[in-house]
């Protein structure tokens, strides 16, 4: 594929670096490594943590963005578009590799404490919509222009529909860390697969989602609502490009470029891959 570069809206880390830091230089290094792999823009994704820890991570990303704005972006690699918060308003039943002890009840006070002074850089937040108080937080985020993804959730279809009505616009790594699809209770996954308005994150490494599942998504979900993400993390990856934490899938070791190659192998057309990895993520953030 002859393209300018990919856009990754969900990356926790790459190589030896990740967002669990208070050092903006590490965030800039992440951006440089991503750029070498063909990614031109990223949304550093902060793990769920205690609010004071997440705020340190937010500050590091904010400072890295400031450094990019003051200098030639090419020096600092992939452009940092803002930040993606994966938590802390998540359901411990669907924690995946996240630290469930950091999950908290969604309240407007907790939201304000988390993002105060950083509202302008928070672009996406993942919330489990079935939690008490979640709908009010979703409504507030939507009013602020923050995209709300449903994820790390045990929500039923009815609860997911209510969240969409409240302002949720996307789904974090569909089928992963959520109630499994069932023929009598489709849950968030079922809504994401069939609804033409909701964007869905797709980890296309062939492990988080079976190749047949990837084909299903590309064949039945409106293409303009599919967003390829890496969900990349730092650390040693397996030969298949995934990272495990105590036997649980903890993230991908791939970049978007690597995911694109996996999609090509299962017959997804280049034009579809380009739309899902460049056009759609930018549109989701309102960037033309």
Say what each PLM segment does.
Residues 13-25, 46, 97-104, 147-151:
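Active-site mouth loops of central-metabolism enzymes
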Residues 4, 33-43, 60, 91-119, ...:
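Active-site gating loops and adjacent loop-to-helix segments of metal-dependent hydrolytic enzymes
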Residues 21-24, 28, 48-51, 55, ...:
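Electropositive phosphate-/nucleotide-binding environments in soluble metabolic enzymes
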């Amino acid at each position: 594929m002859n393209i300018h570069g990919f856009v990754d809206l969900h990356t926790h880390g790459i190589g030896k670096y990740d967002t669990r830091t208070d050092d903006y230089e590490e965030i800039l290094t992440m951006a440089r490594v991503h750029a070498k792999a063909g990614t031109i823009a990223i949304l550093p994704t902060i793990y769920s943590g205690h609010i004071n820890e997440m705020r340190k991570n937010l500050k590091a990303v904010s400072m890295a963005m400031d450094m990019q704005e003051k200098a030639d972006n090419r020096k600092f690699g992939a452009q940092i578009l803002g930040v993606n918060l994966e938590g802390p308003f998540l359901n411990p039943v669907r924690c995946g590799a996240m630290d469930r002890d950091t999950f908290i009840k969604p309240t407007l006070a907790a939201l304000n404490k988390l993002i105060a002074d950083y509202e302008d850089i928070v672009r996406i937040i993942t919330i489990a919509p079935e939690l008490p108080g979640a709908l009010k937080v979703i409504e507030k985020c939507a009013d602020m222009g923050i995209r709300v993804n449903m994820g790390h959730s045990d929500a039923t279809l009815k609860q997911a529909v209510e969240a969409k009505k409240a302002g949720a616009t996307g789904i974090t790594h569909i089928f992963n860390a959520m109630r499994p699809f069932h023929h009598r209770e489709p849950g968030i996954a079922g809504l994401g697969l069939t609804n033409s308005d909701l964007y869905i994150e797709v980890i296309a490494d062939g492990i988080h989602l079976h190749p047949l599942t990837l084909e299903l998504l590309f064949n039945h979900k409106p293409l303009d609502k599919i967003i390829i993400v890496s969900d990349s993390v730092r650390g040693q990856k397996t030969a298949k490009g995934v990272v495990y934490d105590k036997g649980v899938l903890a993230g991908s070791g791939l970049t978007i470029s690597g995911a694109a190659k996996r999609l090509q192998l299962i017959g997804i057309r280049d034009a579809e891959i380009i739309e899902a990895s460049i056009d759609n993520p930018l549109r989701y953030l309102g960037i033309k």
